[in-house]
Amino acid sequence: MNQTLLSSFGTPFERVENALAALREGRGVMVLDDEDRENEGDMIFPAETMTVEQMALTIRHGSGIVCLCITDDRRKQLDLPMMVENNTSAYGTGFTVTIEAAEGVTTGVSAADRITTVRAAIADGAKPSDLNRPGHVFPLRAQAGGVLTRGGHTEATIDLMTLAGFKPAGVLCELTNDDGTMARAPECIEFANKHNMALVTIEDLVAYRQAHERKAS
């Protein structure tokens, strides 16, 4: 990632700390991966605190595929099978079957309905019957070990939520341009500045976690 582009957001460690602070303040974070990987920016929000307005922003400016990142333990708690047995996608993205809240929604498509679905899925006592299948929210199962195991947006989301003190669950959606093309780093930076979002790269988060784990050992 071109560090010059990111310099206004601080050093790599500062970017992670700023992202954690933003999440605790109820703001979103733009997460960039490597230019040699997906080369995308994902808007992420804590599943616990994401507002209807933030969901609407995500739907309006994103790909439309609103994903709920969860751990494998949560996936098992909700009895959500993986979308396919043999995952042949380029990066092995861990989609489960899609979901909808069993109660409190209409068509499930609106920002408010998707928030209701997210909250139902992450509730402390959530059970499989709390969700209908299929639906309009796409759960993603994160790999154990986070970004140190897999350098994906899914794992970055779970790591950031955990480090910020939230439940290990977050909402993500890829940022797109007005013409429907994928937003790259310059557009992601412009969007983050416009919408008061912190910005961090997966590379930043890997370095941050490695440094903290070295200290802990």
Curated annotation (Swiss-Prot):
Which annotated residues bind Mg(2+) 1?
A: E38
Q: Which reaction does it catalyse?
A: D-ribulose 5-phosphate = (2S)-2-hydroxy-3-oxobutyl phosphate + formate + H(+)
Listed A to Z, the keywords are:
Lyase, Magnesium, Manganese, Metal-binding, Riboflavin biosynthesis
Free-text cofactor note? Binds 2 divalent metal cations per subunit. Magnesium or manganese.
**A GO-annotated cellular component:** cytosol
**In the record, what terms sit under GO molecular function?**
3,4-dihydroxy-2-butanone-4-phosphate synthase activity; magnesium ion binding; manganese ion binding
Site feature location: Essential for catalytic activity: H136, E174
- InterPro entries this protein is in? DHBP_synth_RibB-like_a/b_dom, DHBP_synthase_RibB
Q: GO terms for biological process?
A: riboflavin biosynthetic process
Q: What is its EC number?
A: 4.1.99.12
Please name the pathway: Cofactor biosynthesis; riboflavin biosynthesis; 2-hydroxy-3-oxobutyl phosphate from D-ribulose 5-phosphate: step 1/1
Q: Which SUPFAM superfamilies match?
A: YrdC/RibB
The residues that the entry says bind Mg(2+) 2 are E38, H153
List ligand-binding residues for D-ribulose 5-phosphate: R37, E38, D42, R150, G151, G152, H153, T154, E174
| Cofactor(s) for this UniProt protein | Mg(2+); Mn(2+)
Question: Is-annotated flag, keyword Cell division?
Answer: no
Q: How does it assemble?
A: Homodimer.
Family the UniProt entry places it in = Belongs to the DHBP synthase family.
Per the entry, what this protein does is:
Catalyzes the conversion of D-ribulose 5-phosphate to formate and 3,4-dihydroxy-2-butanone 4-phosphate.
- Mind telling me what this protein is named? 3,4-dihydroxy-2-butanone 4-phosphate synthase
Origin species = Escherichia coli O1:K1 / APEC
